[in-house]
Amino acid sequence: MKKLVMLLALVALTSLGATAGADNKTKVKWFGHAAFEIDLPSGKTILIDPWITNPTNPTGKDDVKTVKADLILITHGHFDHIGDATDIAKRTKAHLVATFDLGNAIVAGGYPKDQYGFDTGGNFGGSLDVLGGEATISFVPAIHSSAIGTDPAKAGYGGNPGGFVIVVKGGPTIYHTGDTDLFGDMALIGSHWKVDLMLSCIGDHFTMGPDRAAEAVKLVKAKQVVPMHFGTFPVLTGTPDEFGKALKKTAPSAKLTVMKVGDTITL
């Protein structure tokens, strides 16, 4: 009887350990366009470029009311990247992470001013330890533009466009390119960090298209890549199929993961 009790206890402990290990994962959800949610093992949540109500997301109007956020990261000032940030921030109390000038401009546009400051504002070359040390966020450049507002007569200064490298403690390293063209210094990102997941724009017209995005993956040496910023508008003509073909030629070792809007992957 004693042996049976010990055996059952061992099985229970093994089961609990397996469950804890399964939960100790980072999850990434795509809301369409450039909007991603990163769920950390602790339960904390990072949103990037949260245009949750973008036209590719059929549940956007509901999602924007329920999405969680502890931090909101914005790559640049265009409307399709600031998106629903202010409304989400007012509901969740999420702090804003952005380059300093961009952050100030977003606050001037209505983002709660007590949810942004020197602790979450930075600039290229800088890194922030966030969420009690569970993650480090680094600011990296992008080649794009960053005006705030679509009316040329009223467009405001939005700082410089950029991307983010997010290193989860004991977990994956994720690079969100923001909107950008291919540029040579992407190789420095690949040499400084071991990028597990690259979230890469591929839509062409306003950013690099599939061929140049594949070159970017090669420079970054990303293990896995998820295409984004395509198909939202007719002019964003780059497709995941074209990107996949280019990857096979240019960066064949990279794993291509094509997400559907609303999909979640576990790292």
Task: List the model feature ranges, each with a label.
Residues 2-45, 52-54, 138-143, 261-263:
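Zn-dependent metallo-beta-lactamase
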Residues 48-49, 69-77, 97-100, 174-178, ...:
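Active-site neighborhood of phospho(di)ester-bond hydrolases with catalytic His/Asp-centered motifs
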Residues 54-55, 79-83, 103-106, 124-128, ...:
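Active-site environment of divalent metal-dependent phosphoester hydrolases
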Residues 83-86, 97-100, 106-111, 115-126, ...:
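Glycine/small-residue-rich loop that forms an oxyanion/phosphate-binding "nest" at active or ligand-binding sites
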Residues 107-131, 214, 218-267:
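Binuclear metal-ion centers of metallo-dependent hydrolases, dominated by the metallo-beta-lactamase
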